[in-house]
Structures are given as C-alpha cells and as structure tokens.
Amino acid sequence: MSPSSFPPRINHVAISVDAEVMDEKGRGALLEFYSEVFGWVEGDNSTEQGNPLILYTGSLGQFLYLLPAADEFMVTPNMDHFGIEVSSKEEMQEILDRAKRYQRKDPRVRITDTGAMTTRYQDKEYRLTNAYIWFLIPLWIELQHVELRTDT
C-alpha cells in the first residue's frame, strides 16, 4: 500500500431481512428504535432496488443496509452479531439506558448484561467492555469500548 492510502475497512453491513418484518409498520419500528437508541438516520434509497432501509451510522460511508426478502433472508444462530466501537464506557451506558427505556414500550428488544475482559494486541493489554442489543434484524449489535490497561 502506498503511504497515503489507508487499509481497507468495513464501511457497511448489508442484511436480507424477512419481508414481513420490513412491512410499513416494521420499517417504522426499525427506524424509530435505531434512531432513538443509536442516533442513526434514514438514508435515501431512491436509487436502490428492493426498497431497502438504509441507516447511516455516522457518516455517508458508514451504514446498515436492510433489504426486505420474501424467500431467502438471513437466519442466524443466537448471538451472531456485528460490533460497533463507542468512545467511552459512559457512552455505552447511555446507549444501554436508551435501549432499556425502549424495551419498556417494546418487549421485543433484547439486551445482555455488560461484560469485561482483558485482551492483548501487539504486546499490550487492553480492557474490553461490551454489551449486546438485539431488535428485529437477524444480527445482534455488540457495543465495545477498548482502553489500554495501565495497571499491569
């Protein structure tokens, strides 16, 4: 790679979702939940086929692409997921608090307890704090906060 380029990185996740979940009511629930809990916003799908729900997660190049599928949609074992990194444990807790508030009005929301572990990368130890949230799509979302351990 040239010095001015950056390593390839993930910029979106595309998931085929049961079309029954993606009807008008379901799309509204998905948009409301992911907007309220994560702050994601709906993107323009006017040039896309199949009427996907596009949720921008931060910038134009970072999004979740949910495509309605009648026959062949994603089915996953429990806890298959994708992860998002948060800036602090406090931010993670704020997201979890919003998810718990939403869960009170919609019991389909699932949330795991917050966990923590030590992990190693390039001869350094890090503290990884995480929790998982699920709502209507086949994959859970893992929230992660990683910080360098200074107590070792």
Name every feature range the model reports, one short phrase each.
Residues 39-43, 71, 117-121:
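Intrinsically disordered, low-complexity segments enriched in polar/charged residues with Gly/Pro
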Residues 15-63:
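Core segments of cupin and vicinal oxygen chelate
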Residues 43, 49-87, 91:
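A short, hydrophobic/aromatic-rich structural module that often spans a beta strand
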Residues 1-23, 74-152:
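Vicinal oxygen chelate
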Residues 17-19, 68-70, 118:
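Short, well-ordered turn and helix-capping elements at secondary-structure junctions
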Residues 23-25, 65, 92-94, 143, ...:
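Short acidic, gly/pro-rich beta-turn/loop elements at beta-sheet edges
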Residues 20-22, 60, 71-73, 89-91, ...:
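Generic "edge-of-domain/loop-turn" microfeature
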